[in-house]
Amino acid sequence: MTLLSLQGVACLRGGRLLFEGLDLVLGPGGAAVVKGPNGAGKSSLIRVAAGLLRAAAGTVDRSEAALADEHLALDERQPLGRALAFWATDPAPGIAAMGLEALADVPVRMLSTGQRKRAALARVIASGVPLWLLDEPGNGLDADGLARLEAAIAAHRNAGGAVLAATHQPLALPGALDLSLT
């Protein structure tokens, strides 16, 4: 069973070719980490995989996916627990995984940068979908937040999920494929 398949994928942004001929297949338990300098196309690759950006060439096939990027995608007026409940029938697993229990009744707009990042990741965790697409998931996280993220990813993979992550920061994903964009 394939959760994500990219075959011969190319991406153009602003008339500039970011990458081409990219092949990647992720099955249950799979992971890939995309690395490269600013502007190399890491975020664009995540957006192509999510179906938010059309590939200039190649094919993209994916299962149901959840995306965490720079957009929080939570109603800032709502308490965190209620905002997460919009995306998941039971947001509790995501809240617990990211250590946000004490903030469940706090309006999203009151969260710090790190807490907002944890909330975005809690949304993905609680989604219950097999494929996680993570764009710079460690940005804004402290050491505890990063450890919680890595533990959540490990649990997701052990349960048969897959992860594609683009990052500048070290992210412990044992056995993950390394994709370097230049």
For each predicted feature, which ranges?
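A short, proline-enriched helix->beta-strand linker immediately N-terminal to the Walker B motif
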Residues: 126-130
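Conserved ABC ATPase "signature" region
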Residues: 91-103, 122
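Conserved ABC ATPase signature
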Residues: 107-114
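The feature captures the beta-strand-to-loop junction immediately N-terminal to the Walker
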Residues: 35-37
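Hydrophobic anchor residue at the start of the ABC signature
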Residues: 121, 160
